[in-house]
Amino acid sequence: MTNATDIGANDVEMEVDPTAETLADEKKNQDVAAVQEIREQIRQIEKGVASKESRFILRVLRNLPNTRRKLNGVVFRNLAQSIYPAGADREAAVALMPAVEKDATELPDVPKKQVATKAPIAEVDAYFYLLLLVKLIDASDLKRAGISADALMAKISIQNRRTLDLIGAKSYFYFSRVAELKNSLEGIRSFLHARLRTATLRNDFEGQAVLINCLLRNYLHYALYDQADKLVKKSVYPESASNNEWARFLYYLGRIKAAKLEYSDAHKHLVQALRKSPQHAAIGFRQTVQKLIIVVELLLGNIPERVVFRQAGLRQSLGAYFQLTQAVRLGNLKRFGDVVSQYGPKFQLDHTFTLIIRLRHNVIKTAIRSIGLSYSRISPQDIAKRLMLDSAEDAEFIVSKAIRDGVIEATLDPAQNFMRSKESTDIYSTREPQLAFHERISFCLNLHNQSVKAMRYPPKSYGKDLESAEERREREQQDLELAKEMAEDDEDGF
């Protein structure tokens, strides 16, 4: 019995050890595959530099989200041997690398044939530091990330190579991100302006787009809306920028317009930003834009549809805004105050608190409109009681302002001390239906124009090189005649 028990225990031990070894082997194989993948990306970058084709570099950068998940200290140490020759450059790179995990398995040494003997080209050097910066940000190692970002900017700033523009544009974004995490955005503003001037002079369109977005985010972080508006007016955003950069720019533009009380323009820009953003990714960005759209729609006097709050991935994050919408729709000042006090910190994090405070006037207008529809005559004291105002004089002032603004059609009778509502008129006898149709038609026309611009047509000179059907028939006829003549000449030769 004892022997059988010992044998069973040994079997259990034998089952545990292979599992641990298998996990270690899988981890090692993943690291080897990651190193090989990044080396292939480096070859693509070198190919793009040699052929002066940016599409190879663009293909590598598009794969950055997948690459960043595979990075670790072991991968970086193996790559450094094949990129940098032994010396100061390799030591500087190794000093910034993240620490190797305790359970990590070291990869075999790089073969002598693959060990670097000369310094890498500027594009490969910048790409390695970009990967290093991304990993340090993910690891929340802000001290090393700051040093790595400064080193990367120094490498990019001293170069004047068009093949470095795409990597530089991506680097500016993460450089600004590190400064934001370290709460030092103000310190990099002059550097970003200098790089924007350089990118504009060199026609670096992707760099221009990223730098303008970084500067707008910088200004909005400190609520400098006037400076952000001046930057938008004095700079030209490149049409060839990627969809992601356009989505960011339109979102920042919507925030600026909303802060400056231009709600119609703000709503238009925010809707465009939502359409240009990825439909099945970037959930955080879509949530942020949708929150601002809801607040702007409420400021415009519109009530968002209930289906907006039921979208997958947005339902939980929009819960506070659903309650806010309910309070505005009902014109309930008490409920509006409760929502603002309960979710105030959340609204401040979403950068919508200032706009939501402005909604108080909309809530009052909605309440007065509902009172005007419900009562033909009502005293200011009753209005103050319903709106929970301090005095009847406040209610009288608010009602007179609502009448002046056209919110309600009513008259105030100070002698008898009541508000008399006028009979409701037929809305189809006014210009409102015409204006609504005009807005819809304008939207359809703008959508059509944007769709046409998005299509790619061959240049006009392309058709000049193409022959018509008659020219083709004439050419074929000439070829046949020439072939007959050659055949006759051959026969004559015999």
Curated annotation (Swiss-Prot):
Blood (crystal) cells and cuticle. One of its GO terms (biological process) is ubiquitin-dependent protein catabolic process. The 26S proteasome is composed of a core protease, known as the 20S proteasome, capped at one or both ends by the 19S regulatory complex (RC). The RC is composed of at least 18 different subunits in two subcomplexes, the base and the lid, which form the portions proximal and distal to the 20S proteolytic core, respectively. Keywords: Proteasome. Residues 462-486 have a biased composition (Basic and acidic residues). Residues 458-494 are annotated as: Disordered. Belongs to the proteasome subunit S3 family. This is Probable 26S proteasome non-ATPase regulatory subunit 3. GO terms for molecular function: enzyme regulator activity; zinc ion binding. The lineage of its organism: Eukaryota, Metazoa, Ecdysozoa, Arthropoda, Hexapoda. InterPro entries: 26S_Psome_reg_C (IPR013586), CSN3 (IPR050756), PCI_dom (IPR000717), WH_DNA-bd_sf (IPR036390). Acts as a regulatory subunit of the 26 proteasome which is involved in the ATP-dependent degradation of ubiquitinated proteins. SUPFAM superfamilies: Winged helix' DNA-binding domain (SSF46785). Residues 247-426 form the PCI domain. The keyword Secreted does not apply. It comes from Drosophila melanogaster. One of its GO terms (cellular component) is proteasome regulatory particle.
